[in-house]
């Protein structure tokens, strides 16, 4: 995958962090949220954090160039269209994650990685009943991921080895060190 496309579901603090990671690495990112006000706040926060990173000489590109790689949308289907990797960053709500991963499975090709940033819920809890769940896993980042460039990669028993390897390669490509956890906590 020479030019992967990234999607982020949820525009809160973790979504902001992932967007900066992917865009800073030179890739286009689409960010979805259900509220327009949340997306406007997201854009302000990304701009502010990029400027702070730039002031501390932690960027290779200008904040403006990096921010230009990030697009926001209120349309979930538009957000994941053409994506190779989807990073879910929603609230720690089991029913919400189940519903969201079911939708994501229906909107994406079966080889698209569907990752959750969850720190409390297991992949087996929210993805066990969905189609093509072999591509689902938890990818829990250091916070903020643009400064603490490590992420736990936690597959479920049903997650394929191929999906885990593709995920780890994509993380390395964007400057994140993947630490694989072999058993869900």
Language model feature labels by segment:
Residues 1-52:
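NAD(P)+-binding Rossmann beta1-loop-alpha1 motif at the extreme N-terminus of oxidoreductases
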């Amino acid at each position: 995958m020479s030019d992967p496309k990234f999607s982020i579901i949820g525009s809160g603090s973790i979504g902001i962090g992932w967007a900066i990671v992917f865009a800073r690495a030179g890739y286009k990112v689409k960010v979805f949220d259900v509220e327009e006000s949340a997306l406007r706040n997201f854009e302000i926060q990304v701009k502010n954090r990029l400027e702070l990173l730039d002031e501390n000489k932690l960027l290779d590109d200008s904040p403006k160039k990096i921010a230009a790689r990030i697009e926001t949308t209120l349309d979930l289907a538009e957000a994941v269209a053409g994506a190779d990797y989807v990073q879910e960053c929603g609230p720690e709500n089991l029913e919400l994650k189940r519903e969201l991963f079911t939708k994501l499975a229906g909107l994406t090709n079966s080889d698209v990685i569907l990752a959750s940033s969850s720190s409390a819920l297991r992949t087996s809890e929210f993805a066990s009943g969905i189609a093509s769940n072999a591509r689902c896993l938890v990818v829990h980042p250091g916070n903020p991921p643009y400064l603490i460039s490590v992420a736990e990669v936690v597959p479920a028993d049903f997650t394929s080895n191929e999906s885990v390897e593709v995920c780890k390669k994509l993380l390395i490509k964007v400057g994140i060190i993947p630490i694989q956890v072999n058993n869900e906590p």
